[in-house]
């Protein structure tokens, strides 16, 4: 009887076996993990933790994505040009979790924002140019970047509006992660510039230093990325200091936390500022100068004071140049920028070491203008500058550089006048929305909007000589677009409060 019951349990009552099955599975997994190298084991544990935390809070997955997204170029170099890097994989997983959460809660909604229509127009016009292009698959990859930016913006807005009472916390969290991403790259860049002791020979500057490039593998996009964090950090820092000044007469029990917050933002600004300088990128420097000028101008709520403040700043900077306070190596590099912006036919121009980079850039601008001339309205196809380049290349410049080194000419060549107009409309909407928030937001949240205005300006100016929708920079832009919409919610709430007070 006992033997029969034992056999029945083993054969028929399988539920009794389940705990033992899990134990055996755990033992096998443990044995496999023991055989892994320590570095691989730690990486696996970290990845598992990120996956679990993302399932609980998608915002955590997005935050980690911001940190690892700049690794894309380095991963592609090591792994040989993969389609999806770790940042892209985590982003796709985070978006999938966000959508799945909405479906499970039966609240799959598209948040209303002022950028929904501009994003839709950009997506439609760029997609329209792909059929018949030389390489639709390449154009589709560029198109997916814009789709990702739109989805990231919507996710940030949705997560921020999910619990309105925690909206400010979402804004602070996103700003912190954006600054932390900048710090992580700045530290690498500082090490590359003067602490490592070697580097690519063509990156040598000042005889013994090397241009910083982070994990971007190129100094110019690295400098552009530094601007995203630096200009945002400057705006946030001014916001915190202005809020303190307005409330200095009040007694606060949290000055310690406030000082810690200011210290953290100041550290981020200093490190990313050094990273920007060490990139030795003229385009990034001029983008920073333009972004800083806009931040100074809009810092006071009344623009006449902003104009006076900006004028004073320019005068002081001019005095610094006159007194040679600014290093001559920096001023000399900036002064040569005007040469890079001139137009002209470079066919037949003598090429030498002194003018090589300038002529190369102008040759690619000329090729872009040729594409635009032959395809006025819809261009050669979104993302198809490089595939179409051979037909328009000048004799001495057969190799495409991937883009025209002027994103506006690049876009004109790829999507024509219509596409460039839509792109301009998109950014006009971004600037307009940001300017609106500067009118109504209270400090220190106004500082975030101030930083974003600087970011948009620096980004736009830098793209006069480069293309910055590379190496997952657009992921950070998507989060910033989401921040802008959440700031608009804060501004609307503040406006209603003022109106109620007036009533």
Segments predicted by a language model, with ranges:
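Membrane helix-loop boundary segments at the extracytoplasmic
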Residues: 67, 73-75, 412-415, 447-487
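Membrane-interface helix caps and helix-loop-helix hairpins in membrane proteins
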Residues: 34-36, 78-81, 131-141, 274-279, ...
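N-terminal hydrophobic segments of proteins, predominantly signal-anchor/transmembrane helices
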Residues: 52-147, 447
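Long extracytoplasmic/lumenal interhelical loops at the membrane interface
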Residues: 199, 351-366, 370-415
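Alpha-helical transmembrane segments of multi-pass inner-membrane proteins
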Residues: 1-6, 13-32, 46-53, 95-98, ...
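Membrane-interface micro-motifs in multi-pass membrane enzymes
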Residues: 36-40, 81-90, 141-142, 214-229, ...
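Juxtamembrane membrane-water interface segments that cap and precede transmembrane helices
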Residues: 72-79, 203-215, 398-410
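Flexible juxtamembrane loops connecting transmembrane helices in multi-pass membrane enzymes
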Residues: 208-212, 288, 322-366, 390
């Amino acid at each position: 009887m006992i033997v029969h019951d034992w056999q029945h349990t083993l054969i028929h009552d399988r539920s009794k076996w389940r705990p033992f099955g899990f134990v055996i599975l755990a033992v096998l997994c443990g044995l496999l993990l023991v055989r892994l190298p320590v570095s691989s084991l730690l990486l696996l544990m970290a990845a598992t933790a990120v996956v679990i935390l993302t399932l609980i809070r998608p915002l955590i997955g997005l935050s980690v994505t911001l940190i690892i997204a700049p690794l894309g170029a380095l991963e592609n170099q090591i792994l040989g040009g993969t389609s999806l890097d770790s940042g892209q994989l985590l982003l796709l997983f985070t978006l999938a979790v966000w959508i799945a959460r909405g479906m499970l809660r039966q609240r799959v909604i598209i948040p209303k924002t002022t950028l929904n229509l501009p994003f839709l127009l950009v997506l439609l016009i760029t997609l329209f140019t792909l059929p018949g292009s030389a390489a639709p698959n390449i154009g589709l990859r560029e198109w997916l970047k814009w789709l990702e930016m739109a989805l990231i913006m919507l996710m940030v807005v949705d997560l921020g509006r999910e619990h309105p009472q925690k909206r400010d916390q979402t804004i602070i969290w996103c700003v912190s992660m954006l600054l932390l991403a900048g710090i992580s790259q700045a530290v690498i860049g500082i090490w590359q510039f003067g602490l490592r002791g070697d580097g690519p020979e063509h990156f040598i500057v000042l005889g013994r230093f090397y241009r910083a490039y982070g994990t971007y593998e190129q100094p110019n996009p690295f400098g552009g990325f530094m601007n995203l964090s630096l200009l945002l950090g400057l705006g946030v820092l001014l916001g915190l200091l202005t809020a303190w000044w307005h409330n200095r007469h009040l007694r606060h029990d949290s000055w310690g936390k406030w000082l810690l917050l200011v210290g953290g933002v100041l550290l981020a600004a200093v490190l990313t500022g050094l990273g920007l300088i060490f990139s030795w990128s003229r385009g990034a420097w001029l983008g920073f100068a333009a972004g800083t000028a806009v931040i100074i101008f809009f810092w006071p709520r009344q623009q006449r004071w902003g104009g006076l403040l900006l004028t004073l700043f320019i005068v002081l900077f001019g005095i610094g140049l006159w007194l040679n306070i600014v290093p001559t190596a920096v001023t000399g590099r900036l002064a040569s920028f005007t040469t890079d912006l001139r137009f002209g036919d470079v066919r037949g121009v003598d090429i030498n070491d002194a003018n090589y980079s300038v002529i190369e850039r102008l040759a690619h601008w000329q090729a872009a203008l040729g594409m635009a001339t032959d395809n006025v309205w819809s261009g050669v196809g979104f993302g198809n500058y490089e595939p179409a380049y051979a037909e328009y290349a000048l004799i001495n410049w057969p190799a495409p550089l991937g883009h025209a080194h002027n994103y506006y000419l690049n876009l004109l060549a790829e999507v024509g006048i219509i596409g460039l107009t839509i792109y301009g409309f998109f950014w006009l909407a971004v600037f307009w929305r940001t300017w609106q928030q500067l009118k109504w937001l209270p400090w220190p949240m106004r500082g975030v909007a101030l930083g974003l205005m600087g970011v948009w300006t620096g980004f736009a100016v830098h793209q006069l000589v480069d293309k910055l929708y590379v190496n997952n920079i657009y992921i950070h832009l998507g989060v910033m677009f989401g921040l802008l919409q959440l700031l608009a919610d804060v501004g609307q709430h503040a406006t209603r409060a003022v109106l109620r007070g007036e009533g």
